[in-house]
C-alpha cells in the first residue's frame, strides 16, 4: 500500500479538540500508549499518534476505493448522525446513523429481506399504489415504510456485505464492530481514551464526543475515498 500525503496537521486537530479525552477515572489502560498527558482531570491524546493512524486509514481507504471497494460508515449517536449521513452521501458510501439493528451484517439474509421489502414499498409509493388501498392498510404500510427509511435508508443500495466499515464511536457501536470482527470485515474506528485500541484493524485515537473532532476525522477519510474513486474511474 503506497503512503500518501493527506495534509493532516496538528494545529487543525488542536483547534477541533481532537486531543481531549475522557476523565482520568474513565479510561482504558490499553490506551496508555496513545495518551500524552493529564490536564484538569482529563486525559490528553497524543496527536502525533492520531495523525499517524489517520494517515494509515486514509491510505487504506484510498487504496480500497481505487479498486472499486464498498464502504459502510456507522455512527448512531445524536451528535454524529448528521455528520455520518453527509460524509457518506458525499463519498457515495453506505451508512447507518439511527440505530444498529443487531445482526445487520452477521444475519445478512434477514437484512436483505428487509431491504427488498423497503425497495418494494418505495416503488409502490412512487407509483401511487399505496393511495389506492383502503385507508387503514395504506396507513400501516406508510408507517412500515417510514420505519424502514429510518433504519435502512442509508443502506438501501447495499447489495452485499461492505468491504470496509468506518465506525465513529467504539463504545456506542460495539455490536457493529463485533459483527465486523466475526465476519473478518476490515474496520477503522475512532477510539477515545475509554476504548480498547486492539479490536479494530486501524484505531484512530481521537475525541469521539466533539462534533468538530468527528467532522475533521470523517472529512479526511471521505476526501481519501473520493480521491480513490476518481482514480478508479480514470482507470476503468
Swiss-Prot record:
The keyword Iron-sulfur belongs to this UniProt entry's keyword annotation: no
SUPFAM superfamilies: Ribosomal protein S2
Single GO BP term: translation
Keyword tags: Chloroplast, Plastid, Ribonucleoprotein, Ribosomal protein
CC terms in the record's Gene Ontology section: chloroplast; mitochondrial small ribosomal subunit
Subcellular localization: Plastid, Chloroplast
PROSITE patterns noted in UniProt: RIBOSOMAL_S2_1, RIBOSOMAL_S2_2
InterPro entries: Ribosomal_uS2, Ribosomal_uS2_bac/mit/plastid, Ribosomal_uS2_CS, Ribosomal_uS2_flav_dom_sf
Any one GO molecular function term: structural constituent of ribosome
Pfam families per the UniProt record, alphabetical: Ribosomal_S2
Family that this chain belongs to: Belongs to the universal ribosomal protein uS2 family.
Name of the protein this chain belongs to: Small ribosomal subunit protein uS2c
Amino acid at each position: 500500500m503506497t503512503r500518501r500525503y493527506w495534509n493532516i496537521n496538528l494545529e487543525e486537530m488542536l483547534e477541533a479538540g481532537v486531543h481531549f479525552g475522557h476523565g482520568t477515572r474513565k479510561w482504558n489502560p490499553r490506551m496508555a500508549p496513545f495518551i500524552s498527558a493529564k490536564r484538569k482531570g482529563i486525559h490528553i491524546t497524543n496527536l502525533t499518534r492520531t495523525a499517524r493512524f489517520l494517515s494509515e486509514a486514509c491510505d487504506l481507504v484510498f487504496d480500497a476505493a481505487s479498486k472499486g471497494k464498498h464502504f459502510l460508515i456507522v455512527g448512531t449517536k445524536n451528535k454524529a448522525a448528521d455528520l455520518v449521513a453527509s460524509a457518506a452521501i458525499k463519498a457515495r458510501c453506505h451508512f447507518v446513523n439511527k440505530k444498529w439493528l443487531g445482526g445487520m451484517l452477521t444475519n445478512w439474509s434477514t437484512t436483505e429481506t428487509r431491504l427488498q421489502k423497503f425497495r418494494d414499498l418505495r416503488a409502490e409509493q412512487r407509483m401511487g399504489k399505496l393511495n389506492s388501498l383502503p385507508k387503514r392498510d395504506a396507513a400501516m404500510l406508510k408507517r412500515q415504510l417510514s420505519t424502514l427509511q429510518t433504519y435502512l435508508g442509508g443502506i438501501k443500495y447495499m447489495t452485499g456485505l461492505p468491504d470496509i466499515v468506518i465506525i465513529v464511536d467504539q463504545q456506542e457501536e460495539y455490536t457493529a464492530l463485533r459483527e465486523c470482527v466475526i465476519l473478518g470485515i476490515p474496520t477503522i474506528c475512532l477510539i477515545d481514551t475509554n476504548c480498547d485500541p486492539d479490536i479494530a484493524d486501524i484505531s484512530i485515537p481521537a475525541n469521539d464526543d466533539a462534533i468538530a473532532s468527528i467532522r475533521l476525522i470523517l472529512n479526511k477519510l471521505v476526501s481519501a475515498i473520493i480521491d480513490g474513486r476518481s482514480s478508479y474511474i480514470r482507470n476503468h
